[in-house]
């Protein structure tokens, strides 16, 4: 295996990346290699999918399969090697179906389908050993000896950003929202990668194009979330347990949570959120269920402790699963793209097995003293008081805004974000999103003239809200976003964050502080380009960076 797609990748060798029997995320070499081969297979689907679309015959099932398949290869999503063997065979069948449709359309038009090469010609080997042999030839570092580390790193930047785009598009799709132009853009990016591009400018152009596509995808996902569940509202969320039977829901999928709430209504079972599901409490349709009683635990990397102590079953939706510990292995369930060998997987929103487990397990014996945190400051809530915010800035009550958000993780150096937020002066406002918020969301920040100093915008999926808030402020002050008293301090971990970063760069945002370490696939040569064109900066000392941010905008 060779994998360097996440922030926690091995950096102890001469070349960063996980290249042993098991990666730092817990993914074994077999699964990692099969994931590489699945990406290769999906490129082949896209090659013919682009032709089919140009002929006026797009295949919606193939479009959806591409999203799902790519999502399964994100960090901490699916660790089940047997599942990837099945997906590889399904990918070949899907590719052949799209190819047959292309051939039929061409015959009807009296033309022929242009010859395809590379991934479009792949055929799955008969057994696992053969598949692994194939995978060894199509890994992310394929061609390193010919094109060098900079080109391989830029290809990885495009690929990992594309994985994030596909994940966000899948989130929207399962809520019933999808668009042809998004599928077209994803196909085009995959077909681009299928050609093994080796031009720096073409790769950078493609990366920024994906950033623009991801903005469209996040806008669609925002429409999906608000269309299905209403606009977020500021809401106090209980973070201490209530006596009774209990189910814990982690991940990101609001649709799964909604289906579970419907199925548990009237059963006496309490439902708790975990990790990135915390913002669910701000959506009117979801918080209307009285048995959605609170949030339990912290960010995804705390799950082994959180889940072990939770007295009920756990449902893992979308990404962020870690190897289940023996204390809860028999009471954790997966759904959607998530998978772990030996863990029961639930399909089609049928949560009856999960509910029976909750009824059999003890639940919380007593109600603890109430503690709350406040969420729900999405774009509708913040822009609804925009006049008040603008007046506070003009009056000198608000000096600066910080967006401190992104993915959390267990690596050393992430206390930087806690220190940065807690040291922010009292005349500044901190916006946050993603699970990075758990680093400081129990700190008492207070308010400025009734405006909370800590504004929880939502999930990492809600980056669109943060962008809309920033652009609305820029419009109000008749300036560019880069001219606002606003600093972006971003924590990254996996490929959704890579997609969001590309979106910020595509929008022309500069001087982003990124950490806790820079992506391993960003070579010194690529970093030099990003620094020159976008002013990207690695994080340093929290106090020093905070002072520099305030000084830059005060100058």
From Swiss-Prot:
Keyword Hydrolase recorded: no
**Can you quote the record's cofactor note?**
Binds 1 [4Fe-4S] cluster. Binds 1 hybrid [4Fe-2O-2S] cluster.
Q: Which InterPro entries match?
A: HCP/CODH, Hydroxylam_reduct, Prismane-like_a/b-sand, Prismane-like_sf, Prismane_a-bundle
Tell me which positions the record assigns to the signal sequence: none
UniProt-listed Gene3D superfamilies: 1.20.1270.20, 3.40.50.2030
Reactions it catalyzes: A + NH4(+) + H2O = hydroxylamine + AH2 + H(+)
EC number(s) of the enzyme? 1.7.99.1
Sites where the protein binds [4Fe-4S] cluster:
3, 6, 18, 25
Q: Keywords in UniProt for this one?
A: 4Fe-4S, Cytoplasm, Iron, Iron-sulfur, Metal-binding, Oxidoreductase
Q: List ligand-binding residues for hybrid [4Fe-2O-2S] cluster.
A: 252, 276, 320, 407, 435, 460, 494, 496
Q: What is the name attached to this protein's record?
A: Hydroxylamine reductase
Q: Give the organism, scientific name.
A: Burkholderia lata (strain ATCC 17760 / DSM 23089 / LMG 22485 / NCIMB 9086 / R18194 / 383)
Name the encoding gene, please. Answer: hcp
């Amino acid at each position: 295996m060779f994998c360097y797609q996440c922030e926690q990748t091995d950096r102890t060798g001469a070349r960063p990346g996980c290249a042993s029997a098991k990666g730092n995320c817990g993914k074994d070499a077999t699964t990692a290699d099969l994931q590489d081969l699945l990406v290769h297979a999906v490129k082949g689907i896209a090659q013919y999918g682009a032709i089919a679309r140009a002929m006026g015959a797009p295949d919606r099932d193939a479009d959806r399969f591409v999203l799902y398949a790519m999502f399964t290869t994100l960090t901490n999503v699916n660790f089940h090697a047997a599942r990837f063997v099945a997906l590889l065979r399904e990918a070949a069948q899907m590719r052949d179906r799209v190819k047959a449709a292309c051939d039929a359309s061409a015959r009807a038009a009296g033309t022929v389908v242009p010859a395809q090469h590379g991934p479009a010609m792949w055929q799955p080997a008969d057994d696992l050993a053969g598949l692994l042999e194939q995978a060894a030839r199509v890994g992310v570092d394929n061609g390193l000896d010919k094109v060098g580390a900079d080109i391989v790193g830029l290809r990885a930047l495009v690929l990992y950003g594309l994985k994030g785009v596909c994940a966000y598009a899948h989130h929207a799709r399962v809520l019933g929202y999808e668009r042809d132009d998004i599928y077209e853009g994803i196909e085009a990016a995959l077909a681009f990668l299928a050609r093994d591009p080796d031009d720096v400018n073409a790769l950078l152009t493609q990366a920024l194009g994906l950033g623009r596509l991801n903005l469209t995808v996040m806008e669609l996902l925002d429409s999906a979330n608000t269309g299905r569940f209403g606009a977020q509202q500021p809401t106090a969320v209980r973070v201490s347990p209530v006596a009774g039977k209990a189910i814990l829901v982690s991940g990101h999928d609001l649709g799964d949570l909604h289906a579970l709430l419907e199925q548990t209504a009237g059963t006496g079972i309490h439902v708790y959120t975990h990790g990135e599901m915390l913002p669910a409490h701000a959506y009117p349709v979801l918080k209307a269920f009285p048995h959605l009683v609170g949030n339990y635990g912290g960010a995804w990397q705390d799950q082994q402790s959180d889940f072990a102590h939770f007295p009920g079953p756990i449902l893992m939706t979308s990404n962020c699963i870690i190897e289940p510990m023996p204390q809860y292995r028999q009471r954790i369930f997966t759904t959607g793209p998530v998978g772990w060998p030996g863990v029961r997987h639930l399909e089609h929103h049928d949560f009856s097995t999960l509910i029976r487990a909750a009824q059999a397990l003890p639940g919380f014996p007593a109600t603890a003293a109430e503690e709350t945190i406040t969420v729900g400051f999405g774009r509708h809530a913040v822009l609804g008081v925009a006049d008040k915010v603008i007046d506070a800035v003009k009056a000198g009550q608000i000096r600066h805004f910080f967006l401190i958000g992104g993915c959390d993780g267990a690596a050393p150096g992430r206390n930087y974000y806690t220190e940065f937020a807690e040291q922010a002066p009292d005349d500044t406002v901190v916006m946050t999103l993603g699970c990075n918020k758990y680093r400081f969301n129990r700190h008492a920040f207070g308010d400025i003239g009734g405006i909370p100093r800590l504004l929880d915008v939502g999930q990492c999926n809600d980056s669109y809200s943060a962008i809309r808030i920033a652009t609305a402020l820029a419009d109000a002050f008749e300036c560019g976003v880069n001219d606002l008293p606003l600093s972006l301090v971003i924590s990254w971990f996996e490929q959704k964050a890579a997609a969001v970063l590309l979106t910020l760069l595509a929008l022309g945002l500069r001087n982003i502080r990124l950490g806790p370490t820079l992506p391993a696939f960003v070579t010194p040569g690529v970093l030099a380009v990003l620094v020159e064109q976008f002013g990207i900066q690695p994080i340093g000392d929290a106090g020093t960076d905070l002072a520099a941010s305030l000084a830059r905008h005060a100058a």
